[in-house]
Amino acid sequence: MFSVIFPGQGSQIVGMGKEFYDKFDLVKKLFKEADETLNFSISKLIFEGPKEDLDLTINTQPAIFLISYSIFNVIKTEFNIDLNKAKYFAGHSLGEYSALSCAGYLNFSDTLKILRIRGGAMQNAVPKGQGGMVAVLGSTVETIEKILLENENNFKAQIANDNSEGQIVLSGKTDDLEKLMNVLKDNNIKNIKLPVSAPFHCSLMNNATKIMTEELNKLNFGNSENKLISNVTAEEIENSEDLKELLIKQIENRVRWRESVINMIDNNVNHFIEIGPGKVLSGLVKRINREVKIDTINNTEDIESLKI
């Protein structure tokens, strides 16, 4: 059995998706619709940059979704590979929106619009430079939670991403993260400050939660037979009525990616297909379980060799 997985931020590069755009009218139509939906040329930004503009969260989120959605539809329509046979659809952070759109719960234009709003809300939730994220390597969730508890009167930080065995990301205020990094260093735990301008997936995103609550409540989610795994619970979403609440909770809560992958494997998934730019999730899955099959779809050659 296979699962389809969709990447989040950090996978974007200028020029991504160009091969698909050049080869398939279907993709040209999707890019044109995206430009019209967003009232600016996201196509030009994706293909020409500049990189610093593509890296702005408000642009990155709809851009990565557009690439993932385009590739997904090329696989289905141009190569007649039925990805709806997937046991689960799942995505990392913004990738969860790619998953629910490709799985049939939210239409293309609504997903673009909500991700543009989400990107702006998350970027503006904390003044620039006042929050950030730190990656911790070679430790465990239990160890990090113990350190956070022991130092709760000294600094505040939250686990934002539980990505894989030995890769955890924390969010917090810049000053608190400096203190955290010193404590981690004292404990011989390797850590790296990430080049992001906001502390995603923690309580500092509260203003973004308010905006997204209002915006998500305006949307109509459809029904689908396809099963989704939630970032918030790492479990199957049993009822599509829970989608909005889980997407709202996702903004301030940790992305339980490691647990999500383990849960899918425990439910007989032995093949993961990553659809979108880069191969970040493929690397994480490999760290979690070396036995499973992984396909990363970045070009048409990858699709031609895909077997499900």
What residue spans do the PLM features occupy?
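Short alpha-helix immediately C-terminal to the canonical SAM-binding loop
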Residues: 177, 282, 303-304
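Short, flexible loop segments at boundaries between secondary-structure elements
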Residues: 233, 293-308
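Alpha/beta catalytic cores of group-transfer enzymes, especially the acyltransferase/condensing modules
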Residues: 10-11, 38, 103-252
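A short, well-structured juxtamembrane/interface segment
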Residues: 255-263
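Soluble or luminal CAZymes and related metallo-dependent hydrolases
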Residues: 26, 252-256
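Catalytic histidine-centered segment of alpha/beta-hydrolase-like enzymes
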Residues: 202, 276, 306
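FabD-like malonyl-/acyl-CoA
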Residues: 1-144, 271-300
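Non-catalytic positions within long, well-ordered alpha-helices that form the structural scaffold/packing
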Residues: 265-268
